UniProtKB/Swiss-Prot annotation:
Species in which this protein is naturally found: Swinepox virus (strain Kasza)
Any Pfam family: M11L
GO-annotated biological processes: regulation of apoptotic process; symbiont-mediated suppression of host apoptosis
UniProt name for this protein: Uncharacterized protein C10
InterPro entries, per database record: Bcl-2-like_sf, Poxvirus_F1/C10
Amino acid sequence: MYKKYNSNVCIRNVLYVYLKYNTINKLSRYERMIYTKIKNQCEAIKYRYCNDFNSVTCILEYDENKYIDNVHKEVISILLSDSRPSIKLAAISLLSIIIDKLICRNIRIAKYIIDDIINIISEDGIYIILFLDEFDKYTDTRCRRRGLSMMIASIVTYYCLRYVLKI
């Protein structure tokens, strides 16, 4: 099983690499595995909720400092009130989109946002890791069932066609 301290440090390291675009070479093998899982989940969340995230980032373009402070406060209050791993992954996705918009213009604000939110997200890193592992098990099981169903269907189809063409 995972140790709580190591998982918190692991999540913190992975999030810093993911959000600050550092090289993945600094991560251990286990952290790279977690990085890949978090990146895949965050990309899926970005794809699924791209319209909502785009509306937030369009608002940010008008008055950057004011809206970033508001978004920062809202994300922190949501993370403190609801500590589910899915909420944390959605916050990471939103944060990565905001940083994509801001990284060229205002690095100080991006760093301010990153440090506070990463500390809150990584407090219970074990739950994020367990959530990602459970999601992978669910996906693997679903793919295996689908593969088995397709195999059985193809065998039945083969013998049905063989019988029909023989007559």
